Design a protein with these regions (language model features):
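Structured interaction patches on ligand/partner-binding surfaces of diverse proteins
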Residues: 59-87
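Post-HEXXH active-site segment of zinc metalloproteases
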Residues: 202-215
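Active-site scaffold of zinc-dependent metalloenzymes
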Residues: 142-205
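Zn2+-dependent metallopeptidase catalytic core
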Residues: 43-45, 59-62, 89-132, 141-147
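Short Pro-Gly-centered beta-turn/loop motif in secreted/extracellular proteins
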Residues: 15, 41-51
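Short, acidic Ser/Thr/Gly-rich low-complexity loop/linker segments typical of extracellular
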Residues: 23-39
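Short, ordered, surface-exposed loop/turn motifs in non-cytosolic proteins
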Residues: 3-27
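A short, amphipathic beta-strand motif
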Residues: 1-7, 38, 111
Length: 215
């Protein structure tokens, strides 16, 4: 599973890293996580063409999308493919949700991988981080509600508008407003900016964050 940033890597495909690949034929089901370069290998064999999909639940401990009861993260269908495996290359011309989710996935994967002492040496964001993408908003935030931050209802309404009640019900940690934004570098950098706030939250804790978020 690869992606192309036309302005980076010489325009050549590179992996969608750590994402969950699911395939099934009727009730037969298997899944695997991609490696850094986008390769994956299913533990089960299929005799006919299975349906493939990406579920944006990353092996590095973050999920993209709503935390529903039965589905833990957003899912993008890839269609039927060969039983021996399906190759997919995602570009900015692909279905927009798939493109945005894949860029955010890579940004979060890279950020978390680089938090160690041998690289950036900063606090890793909390595990089970919940990231939401809003296509009709242009601002982003690190509300950290799934991890216990208490945000005043009026502040949520002011910032998130019509989405406020949804946010209070499903409790995201990071919200990304991607209205009018498409470039890989733009989506990537905005995601990393909010992840830096999540690292700050992991460092200072909930009580500080409840006050800090107002600013």
């Amino acid at each position: 599973i690869t992606i192309i940033d036309k302005d980076g890597n010489g325009g050549q495909p590179f992996g969608v890293a750590g994402v969950k690949v699911i395939c099934n034929v009727f009730v037969k089901y298997s899944y695997a996580y991609t490696d850094r370069d986008g390769y994956y290998s299913m533990s089960k064999k299929f005799s006919s063409k299975p349906r493939y999909r990406l579920r944006f639940k990353n092996k590095e401990g973050f999920n993209i999308g709503f935390n529903k009861v039965l589905v833990s993260a957003s899912t993008s269908a890839l269609g039927k493919g060969p039983s021996e495996g399906m190759d997919v290359t995602i570009t900015s011309s692909s279905e927009r949700k798939l493109w945005c989710r894949s860029v955010v996935n890579n940004a979060a994967y890279d950020y978390i991988k680089r938090c160690g002492k041998e690289d950036m040496d900063i606090k890793v964001p909390p595990k089970n981080l919940r990231i939401w993408i809003f296509q009709n908003m242009d601002s982003s935030s690190a509300v950290m509600m799934r991890h216990g931050a208490f945000i005043d209802g009026s502040l949520i309404a002011k910032f998130l508008g019509d989405y406020a009640s949804l946010v209070k019900l499903f409790l995201p940690d990071i919200t990304l407003g991607f209205k009018g934004k498409t470039a890989y570098s733009t989506l990537y950098s905005e995601t990393c900016h909010e992840l830096a706030h999540a690292s700050h939250f992991a460092q200072v804790g909930k009580k500080y964050w409840d006050k800090y978020i107002e600013f």
